[in-house]
Design a protein with these regions (language model features):
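Conserved active-site and cofactor/substrate-binding residues in soluble primary-metabolism enzymes
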Residues: 10, 31, 35, 64, ...
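C-terminal auxiliary extensions adjacent to catalytic cores
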Residues: 385-431
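Flexible, glycine/charged-enriched surface loops at secondary-structure junctions
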Residues: 203-209, 290-296, 356-361, 428-430
Length: 431
């Protein structure tokens, strides 16, 4: 819709304007971001090709000159004779017809279109016309459309010191599924002081949020008083330490993140701290002194749908199969992930336009793992995700060495990806 109607973050009329970081993540071989980009390269991603042409020195990462990148993308699209560019705000989606539509409007989707997406997302018997006419507040969410995300850190299971923690469920109800990190009064005081001193991410004006009381950043809870955490996410009541027979002064609970039990979520630890500060503060928690993090906590403005409820593995809506979602609005996080899902949606849309059924990408690939997460995560607690090895399926054999395990996962992913491309009639681009 730019420049007819702009957003609070964009400055130009160019496509693909990068408003935050200029980094497209690690280019180190056998890392998860590298794997996703390698699959994109083999699928012939135009945006990745342009990013390489606009790259600036950034060590082992792919970073771009953001002005040159946006200009080159805009030029490539406007010069393509088969693409018609319409500079106008879209406020409705034709879900009833058979025209394939991809919704890829990003985290700053306009309010009018957000209302339309909320209407599409409602169960059919509840999607009444007058419902869509009510404005959706941007500090709230509808049942299937959210306006900011709150993400708790995820720690690698192998990096938890199990000699310092214990398994238990609160009041011994159900099975002992939580890892509990107990704190003494002194340990809690050190953690609390470090948390209050930690630096937060600086917000732009358009990113400022009005938090839900039920989903406050942990540092915001801490600012309300020295004991607020002990009566909130670090509440020890009902979590007796079997080693001492006593209730700890405070407890941090870790919840299993996947079926493989190789990663754990820090319950209630969504935060708005800088990543380096998170690592420093969270490693003060007993048992996490040497913690390795798959993901750090985040809270930021973000419009996205409850994809596990709404989307198929082909990124099509379950209720409206001619409508596909891609990019951050479908529940992925980051430039590379957004480009990748856009590429996938485009491939599926092309198949549909040719009268073919879209073929889901293989589960073992980075493409497939990213979409599998988006479409199979717990819809009651769905949060956007970056590509990490945590999303990829485990190997058939256990490999303790992390680097070797990741190398083998990448090898399997690319083999499966190439076979999928061949089956879909799009031979992979070789090096």
């Amino acid at each position: 819709m730019r420049p007819v109607r702009s957003t609070p973050a964009h400055q130009t009329a160019d496509f693909a304007e990068l408003v935050c970081s200029n980094s497209l993540k690690s280019d180190s071989e056998n890392t998860a971001p590298w794997l996703l980009k390698e699959e994109m390269r083999r699928a012939g991603s135009l945006l990745l090709e342009i990013a390489r042409e606009c790259a600036v020195p950034a060590g082992h990462a792919l970073a771009v000159d953001r002005v040159a990148f946006a200009a080159r993308v805009t030029e490539a699209i406007t010069r393509e004779g088969r693409i018609t560019v319409r500079r106008e705000e879209i406020t409705s989606v034709d879900e009833a017809g058979e025209q394939v539509t991809i919704v890829a409007t990003g985290p700053l989707t306009s309010e009018s279109l957000a209302e339309e997406i909320a209407r599409l997302s409602e169960p059919q018997e509840r999607a009444e016309p007058e419902r869509a006419s009510r404005p959706l507040p941007h500090n709230s969410h509808s049942p299937h459309l959210y306006f900011y995300d709150s993400i708790s850190p995820i720690v690698e299971a192998d990096s938890i010191d199990m000699t310092r923690v214990y398994l238990a469920a609160r009041y011994d109800k159900g099975s002992a599924d939580y890892i509990n990190c107990p704190m003494t009064k002194g340990e809690y005081s050190r953690f609390y002081d470090a948390l209050l001193e930690a630096q937060s991410v600086e917000e732009r004006d358009w990113e400022k949020l009005n938090y839900f009381e039920g989903c406050l950043p942990i540092e915001e809870i801490a600012r309300r008083g020295r004991d607020t955490l002990r009566f909130g996410p670090m509440k020890p009541v009902g979590l007796m330490d079997p080693r001492t027979g006593k209730m700890p002064y405070a407890v941090v609970q870790l919840r299993q993140e996947n079926l493989r039990a190789d990663s754990y979520n820090l319950v209630g630890f969504q935060n708005h701290l800088k990543f380096g500060e998170q690592a420093r503060v969270l490693r003060l928690i007993p048992g996490l002194e040497n913690a390795q993090f798959f993901r750090y906590g985040q809270i930021h403005r973000n419009t996205y749908i409850n994809a596990p409820t709404l989307l198929r593995e082909t990124l099509q809506m379950k209720a409206h199969p001619y409508v596909l979602f891609a990019g951050q609005i479908c529940g992925v996080e980051g430039y590379v992930e957004s480009i990748a899902t856009g590429l996938m949606a485009g491939m599926h849309a092309a198949a549909m336009a040719s009268g073919l059924d879209p073929l889901p990408s293989p589960r073992a690939s980075a493409f497939g793992s990213l979409v599998h997460y988006v479409t199979h995560a717990d819809p009651r607690n769905f949060q956007p995700a970056n590509i990490t090895f945590d999303l990829l399926p485990a190997l058939d054999k256990k490999v303790r060495d992390r680097k070797e395990r990741h190398r083998l996962q990448c090898e399997l992913a690319l083999r499966e990806f190439d076979a999928w491309m061949e089956k879909a009639g799009m031979p992979a681009v070789r090096a």
